[in-house]
Amino acid sequence: MCKNILLIFSFALTISAFAQENVDSLYITTSDSVKLFVKRSGTGYPVLFIHGGPGSNSYYFEKEGGDVFSKDVQLVYFDQRGCGRSDSSSLNDYSLTRVVKDFDEIRQKLGYKQWMIIAHSFGGILATQYAYEYPATIKAMVYLNCTLNLPYTAQSAIMKGLEFLSNNKEDRKYFLNDSIPLLKRWGDMFDTLRKERIVYKLMFDQAQSKAYDDSLMSLPFLKYVYAQKLWNYSEYFDDFSPKTSQINVPVLVISGTRDYTIGVDHYKLMHFPNMEVKLLEGAHALYFEHNKELYEAVTPFLRKYSD
């Protein structure tokens, strides 16, 4: 395992050294006066990375191997409002409509007529809403281990977590009790697995990967305000999969065969008219633990639509 992690680090450092030659960072102020951190890496056709969480930041993808794609396209990283290195909203506005409006204001400020999207995890919900509201701005999209239905994802994590807990009778009694709110049981499952030191199994193949990710996400300059606020907006817990049938841009869906955080069959809920699906061996962090395989699966798609 240690050897595999060292190989991942070595490959990521090589890509980082390449990308540093073509990197610029800036802050873009939205129409409601929120300063968003934006970073461009590489050259070529612009590709917006929409991070997950909910309410995480783009730092994990960049530092855990995602920057490999900057060899072929220009990755546009940004931290969503109230996330990472971006400011919080003074108006306390974290509504879905406002968040996706941020995406398009970034596009306009950077001067792109169109761009592609790579969305990860919870970013799938945001990407779907963005494509639904601003269809003319998107050339193509990559959905990387994305959810379009948070309740479905919560249920998937609970069921797999019970397997990891050996289907203990008392655990099943609590976690399958529908009188307890689903989101509470979801959070409690993560807490229970964390106490047992096996929470990594929902997201990663290796415990070392989770430890490294935790070390990045706990850096003091990263904020998590959006992660706290979005739970007050019921709209985020809708089922977004019906909207996929109305989104006509080319879509590549990547799903990890061991992505128990999202659900290994979640991709079957997606019905984009122009969709290609690729299943890759691995968990939720394919960009980190299976970087080479992910790069080889996604890059031909990016190149195809980069004209």
What annotation goes with each model-predicted range?
Residues M141-S179:
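Flexible "cap/lid" loop of the alpha/beta hydrolase fold
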Residues A283-Y295:
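Catalytic histidine-centered segment of alpha/beta-hydrolase-like enzymes
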Residues G55-G66:
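The serine-hydrolase catalytic nucleophile loop
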Residues R98-W115:
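Conserved acidic catalytic loop of the alpha/beta-hydrolase fold
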Residues F69-D87:
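Conserved alpha/beta-hydrolase
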Residues I247, V253-S255:
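Short beta-strand/loop motif that positions the catalytic acidic residue
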Residues Y260-D265:
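Conserved alpha/beta-hydrolase "acid-adjacent" motif
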Residues K113-A157:
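Conserved hydrolase catalytic core segment
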